[in-house]
Amino acid sequence: MTAIGSDVWLGIDLGTQGVRVVVAASDGSLLGAGSCPLTSHREGDRHEQHPEQWWRAVRTAIGRAHAAGADLRRVQGVAVDATSGTITMLDRSGLCVTPALMYDDGRAAAETDQVNAAGERQWAKAGYQRMQRSWALPKLRWLLNHYPHAAEDGWRVAHQNDAINSKLVGHEVPTDTSNALKTGADAAQVTWPERVLDALEIPRAMLPDLVLPGTVIGQVCAAAAAETGLTEGTAVVAGTTDGCAAQLGSGATAVGSWNSVMGTTLVLKGVTKDLVRDPHGVVYSHRSPSGHWLPGGASSVGAGLVAREFADADLDMLTREAGALLPTDLLRYPLVSPGERFPFIAPDARAFGSREPATRAESFAALLQGAAYVERLCFDYVDLLGAPTDGAIVLTGGATRNPLWNQLRADVLQRPVSLPRNTQPALGMAVLAASSRAPLDSVAAAMVQLDRTLEPRRSAKNPHEEGYLRLLDLLVQRGWLPGVVATHARERTAP
């Protein structure tokens, strides 16, 4: 039971397939949750959403959280996360006037070359070296090419959560450096790179002001209060991207700690005191509300293949059979889609296996093992960059529903891994909202409740070392994994 005097916070996760809302107390008690689906359109490199559905979905999800028992009158603050790199444009009255170009929309290939030529020094300073065509700044240049009257008509850029925040407060709002990172924001200085923008002919007036995540940017206005049930005057707090939100919701906020999300794909995010600079452009860093840095990367390996390859299988039985086969000498690199982004960049990478599986259970075992090996290589990579990896490792994502996979990941890493009781970005936004009143680490420690910690099974020699080293060799042979990375990973396997 939550104490009557306990503060309450509301987090909104604005995703691709839906909006999720969590109402949580300062002690971590979940008081209510709600969701509402979203639709989008994919065609080739194109991926769009109609932004007008976002506010309707947010209102519906908040209403469902209230119906589930949350007393919205007690909410002290609201924060919204969004998919990284998703942008739209608003007119002078705040209405969305273009489709939203989603986080993985890839139409801005030519504009990406233009952006990287103009901002080469700035992107190197930021640590990620080059922008990718799915990032927001190339997409903004693409929008301006297709809507040449935008600047004259007073249009301005809005990240996905900016559109919701402006609805909540009733006027234009600053954006957070996390969502603005892929639009070119200098997170260290909390400024826009105006020389780069000038070179790209992007008016500075088209971009919102910048603040760090966790900054109070306004209060719920009367109109939004009437539509949502929130109290007028409730604080609206600058949010972050969905990946950073998931990290906050995992409780991995202290320097050296890491959140490894094995969902459809693998995302690894950590906390460092200083900015991590990556000469290979694989890892990029967001700013934490605490002022620390949140380096990370997203692989194209993950649990997405489970649904694709084993949709008709009895997964419980398959898991039992796979457990008896581990470790297996069948090595798989289980890419969900072509191309790899982390722990190396290889656009031509394709999923592969070292041989044909003898049984379906062996193929399943090799999938679990392969993803765990890639996760280990990701940790080896960030260690090579100088990031501390000695803190807690928290596992989240759909793969954590498989107990065999959880234990396998601990065994491969030879590190304890923890699993939170509630794992969702919306909870991370409730944590972020609460951090506007108290230090982030203390807020996360109070609000994120761990379910259990798994210890790795110890032996004189890690039974997975031989397979891991063989996988490194296969990746080097294909020309995907740089030799310096493979050498460092091999050195870290030495006793």
Which ranges hold each PLM region?
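Residues at the N-termini of beta-strands
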Residues: 18, 74-77, 209, 354, ...
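Structural signal for short hydrophobic segments within the conserved structured cores
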Residues: 32-36, 208, 452
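Pocket-flanking alpha-helical
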Residues: 88, 110-114, 246-248
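A conserved helix-loop-beta module that forms one wall/lid of the active-site cleft
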Residues: 200-212
